[in-house]
Structures are given as C-alpha cells and as structure tokens.
Amino acid sequence: MDKGNRKKVGLLGGNFNPIHHAHLMMADQVAQQMNLDKVLLMPENIPPHVDEKETISAKHRVKMLELAIKENPRLGLELIEIERGGKSYSYDTLKLLTEANPDTDYYFIIGSDMVEYLPKWYKIDELLKLVTFIALRRKDTISKSPYPVTWLDAPLLPISSTMLREMFAKNIEPTYFLPQNVIDYIKTEKLYKKR
C-alpha cells in the first residue's frame, strides 16, 4: 500500500480512573506534534500492573472518557481491551488492531517514566514490530532507551488519578484538574466515595 495513504493513529492506553487534563493534554499534544490523524484513548480492562480493587467498572471509565473527549475531534476511543475482556497486554491488543487495520500505522504513547520499564513489557520485541513508541520527555527522567522511542517535548501536568480519587473521597472537588462534565458525572454516580 502507498505509504501516503496510510492512517497515523496514536494510542494512549491507561486505566483512566478517572481521566484528567494531563491525559488529555498528552494525547492532544502528540496528535498535533506528530501530525496524527487521531489519538485514541484506550482504557484497559484488567491492567496487568494495577490492583483491581482500585479500579471502578469499565462502564464508568468509558463514560468519563466519552464526556472528556467529546469536544476534541483529534481524540477518540478504542475499546478493544474492554470488549476483549481479561488482562490487557499491549502486544495482544496491537496484534489484533494491526490485523484488523492493515492500512494504519500505530503510535503508542507513554510517559517518559514508562520507558525504563519497556524491557519488562510482555513480548516487547514483537510489539516493536507493530508500533512506534512516542514518549513525552520529563525534566526528571533520562531520555534514553535501548528500544527505538520517539521523544517529544510537551508540558506535563503533575496530576494523578490516585490524587483525584483521594480528593473525591475527602469531598474536595478537583476543579480544573479534569473536565467539569467528568466531575459532574463522578458526583452524580457517587464514584470514589469512601465506603
């Protein structure tokens, strides 16, 4: 296939528990800087590295993502890991995506803190044949990797989903940390309340 007709799609995987402005800014900046057709936010079903007890249902995480991205045409959703079920391994996901979309080049977006863990990723050598890694550089991390990684500079917000869950549990509204429509959804659904 002619390289010029290929789609360029970024993937930002995560638990998104909840989605926040740091996730959104990262996705949008990569879309713009790499001239991607779209960046798809891809919620994990059962992440292999996160304590399941801390993860709310996929239904709520997907709804929050839908609310968060609805105003940005550069962003979309990829629900393959939710639909597939089970543990979410990037290699398995990318194998399915590349087989289903042979006209698409995928760019997997990670924070620079994840680059050092690439050697521990499931089937990393095979994964590298399916995807280009894009890492956003942080001042406090080393921009080196034994694997091919495209490094981008973008402002990174010091926001974490853990911090936001703790704020909600203490009845502190994290205004400006995540979209207001997501805050409203969390409050309506009474998510992240202490039991």
UniProtKB/Swiss-Prot annotation:
GO biological process: NAD biosynthetic process
Catalytic activity field: nicotinate beta-D-ribonucleotide + ATP + H(+) = deamido-NAD(+) + diphosphate
Family under the similarity heading: Belongs to the NadD family.
InterPro entries cross-referenced by the UniProt entry: Cyt_trans-like (IPR004821), NadD/NMNAT (IPR005248), Rossmann-like_a/b/a_fold (IPR014729)
GO molecular function: ATP binding; nicotinate-nucleotide adenylyltransferase activity
Keyword Protein biosynthesis: no
Record Gene3D superfamilies: HUPs
Pfam family membership, one: CTP_transf_like
Broadest EC class assigned to this enzyme: transferase
Protein purpose: Catalyzes the reversible adenylation of nicotinate mononucleotide (NaMN) to nicotinic acid adenine dinucleotide (NaAD).
Designated name of the protein: Probable nicotinate-nucleotide adenylyltransferase
Keywords: ATP-binding, NAD, Nucleotide-binding, Nucleotidyltransferase, Pyridine nucleotide biosynthesis, Transferase
Enzyme Commission (EC) number: 2.7.7.18
Pathway in which the depicted protein is active: Cofactor biosynthesis; NAD(+) biosynthesis; deamido-NAD(+) from nicotinate D-ribonucleotide: step 1/1
